[in-house]
C-alpha cells in the first residue's frame, strides 16, 4: 500500500518515493500533526510528488501482528519482508504509475533499502537521497552499536531533565511490567525489555515530546 501526496498545482512534478526507517515502521501519515511528523515534507513537495510506501508487514501492507505457525514458519515468512522484496514492491509501484525514473529518499533502515535499490535497479532512479542507513567503513557492528547506546543514554538523561516526573512514572511502569501487569490493547503482556524499547523514539526529531 502506498499513498500519493502532492500540492494542488504539483501533480505534474516528478515522483519521490520515501523509504521509511525501522524496520517494521509504517510510512508517516501526512494528515497527522504530531511532533514526529517529517519536517522535510513541505520542502520535498516543492520539487516532487511524494509516494509514501507502507513497507511489507507494516501499516496497510499486510501488517505483521500475531505470530502464525512454529518458529521455522515464522522465520520463513519474515524472509519475504526484507529490503530486497521492498525494492521489488517499489518497482511494481513505479511501473503502475507509468514512469521511467523516480527519485528515492532513504531514512535509516530505508537507507539500506535505497542502497539495495541502487545496486539492483540503478536505471530506475533519477536520484537517491540518504539520511542514514549507510554501513560504516572499517568499523564493526559492535563499534556502531556502542556509539549508538552512548547517544541514547545521553538522550535519555536529557529527556528526564526536561520531564523529571517521567522518571518516576517509568520506574512505576517498569515495576508493573516486571509483574506482568501491563498489557497492550490486543492483550499482549508488556515485559520490561519491551517497555524500555519505547526509548528508541528519543533518537528522532520530536521524540521526547512524543514519548512524554
Where are each of the predicted segments found?
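Gly/Pro-rich cap/lid or specificity-loop segments adjacent to the active site
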Residues: 3-186
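Alpha/beta-hydrolase fold active-site neighborhood
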Residues: 180-212
